[in-house]
Swiss-Prot record:
This is Uncharacterized protein HP_0560. It is found in: Membrane. Keywords: Membrane, Transmembrane, Transmembrane helix. It is a single-pass membrane protein. Its main location: membrane. It comes from Helicobacter pylori (strain ATCC 700392 / 26695) (Campylobacter pylori). The chain crosses the membrane at residues 3-23.
Length: 26
């Protein structure tokens, strides 16, 4: 179960970086 939470955590971090990247491009 810990592995699943680790993957979800990495996905959230990835999405946050993508959002910040888009906001900075404005």
């Amino acid at each position: 179960m810990g592995i699943i939470y680790l993957i979800l955590f990495l996905i959230v971090i990835y999405l946050l970086y993508r959002i910040l990247d888009v906001l900075e491009q404005k």
